[in-house]
Swiss-Prot record:
Assigned protein family: Belongs to the GatC family.
The protein's name: Aspartyl/glutamyl-tRNA(Asn/Gln) amidotransferase subunit C
Keyword flag Protein biosynthesis: yes
Gene3D superfamilies, per database record: Glu-tRNAGln amidotransferase C subunit, N-terminal domain (1.10.20.60)
Source domain of life: Bacteria
UniProt keyword RNA-binding, yes or no: no
Subunit structure: Heterotrimer of A, B and C subunits.
C-alpha cells in the first residue's frame, strides 16, 4: 500500500500540521517507509508469545490505603472567596 501526495496532504491536515506542497513528496515517502516497516512487523510469527508491557517484570510500589484529610484544608480554603465550617460556600443554585 503506497501513500500518495494527496493522502499525505490529508494526513497532514488531519494532524493539523502545516506542510508546504514542495514537502509533500518527502512526507509521502516517509509515511510509505513507516507503513513498509509495519508490514514487516505483521510478518513476524508471534504465535504462543505472551503479551507483555516490558522486557523486565516490574511491580509498582504500593502505599497503605489510609484515609487522610490531606492535611491542607486550611491552605486550600484560604483561597476560597467564602468558606464555612471547613467547606466551600457557594450561592444557592436550585430553589
Amino acid at each position: 500500500m503506497a501513500i500518495t501526495e494527496d493522502e499525505a496532504r490529508k494526513v497532514a491536515h488531519l494532524a493539523r500540521i502545516a506542510v508546504k506542497d514542495a514537502d509533500l513528496p518527502a512526507l509521502a515517502q516517509e509515511l510509505n517507509g513507516i507503513l513498509h516497516f509495519m508490514e514487516q512487523l505483521n510478518e513476524v510469527d508471534v504465535e504462543g508469545v505472551q503479551p507483555m508491557t516490558g522486557v523486565e517484570p516490574m511491580r509498582l510500589k504500593r502505599r497503605q490505603d489510609i484515609v487522610t484529610d490531606g492535611e491542607m484544608q486550611d491552605l486550600i480554603l484560604k483561597n476560597a472567596p467564602d468558606a464555612r465550617e471547613g467547606f466551600f460556600a457557594v450561592p444557592k443554585v436550585v430553589e
